[in-house]
């Protein structure tokens, strides 16, 4: 079978939104070529450094590659992807050039091409994200492994916003806590919460592809006795109280439900949220405070922030 590799040149800010659009359109695999990765060390447990080829990365911006089977409707699929991307600036998401190119690849090439971008990555003192096809042995009894299949949906769990959310969970989750993960995507935050000792995690996403991906990853990590996954729009119809809510979403989406978060999380409970570009920190903080939260801590990584807020 022949496959088409669709490459989109965009910005770091738009990576998650564009990746989501591609998965929604039916991509069978997505790879992200971000030149920022060239300055990061990726160490294996035996001290080797992953060698990344600068020639495979754009000089500026981010290149997102998605793989689609060649069908008679491919042109319509690409047109739909372009239309969805063109709408992003209306949500204050800068898309850069947004240029789209299409190349033909053989099945044996696409099946492994995108995997070269994914390796075990230690994202905190506690957690290492490991792709399912990699063999990895923890370096200490304290190290916790989260296995993910990034070919299914919604990235590898190593984006700065995901990393900060996991680090915030490490600081705040107490054994026996009840937690809701809004916009779960791959399920990585729910899995982390379960491995940190939560007694119950409800993971929700509006996208059925995300629900399927999260369910698979939850089972893969043997946390399905703690994490339940369901389809839902934000916190609509969800009853509390719970100890903690975590939401790694676009800033524009976060602004839709601070009041619902205050309703569902118990008094004195926490709301951890990210997906927030630094320029939008103030508007998110103000919305949370208006809903009755107190900002306890702001984590920063590259151009992104995560906020830990406590309910009144």
UniProtKB/Swiss-Prot annotation:
Q: Does the keyword Ligase apply?
A: no
Single GO MF descriptor: protein-lysine N-methyltransferase activity
Is the keyword Transferase assigned to this protein?
yes
InterPro entries given in the database record:
Ribosomal_L11_MeTrfase_PrmA (IPR050078), Ribosomal_PrmA_MeTrfase (IPR004498), SAM-dependent_MTases_sf (IPR029063)
Indicate the secretion signal residues. none
UniProt xrefs under Gene3D superfamilies: Vaccinia Virus protein VP39
What SUPFAM superfamilies does this protein's entry cite? S-adenosyl-L-methionine-dependent methyltransferases (SSF53335)
**Keywords from the UniProt entry:** Cytoplasm, Methyltransferase, S-adenosyl-L-methionine, Transferase
Compartments, as annotated in UniProt: Cytoplasm
Reaction equation(s) it catalyzes: L-lysyl-[protein] + 3 S-adenosyl-L-methionine = N(6),N(6),N(6)-trimethyl-L-lysyl-[protein] + 3 S-adenosyl-L-homocysteine + 3 H(+)
Q: Which residues are noted in the entry as S-adenosyl-L-methionine-binding? A: 162, 183, 205, 248
Write down the EC number.
2.1.1.-
Under the heading PANTHER family, the entry gives: ELECTRON TRANSFER FLAVOPROTEIN BETA SUBUNIT LYSINE METHYLTRANSFERASE
Q: Which NCBIfam families match?
A: prmA (TIGR00406)
Protein name per its UniProtKB record: Ribosomal protein L11 methyltransferase
Task: State the organism named in the record.
Answer: Bacillus cereus (strain Q1)
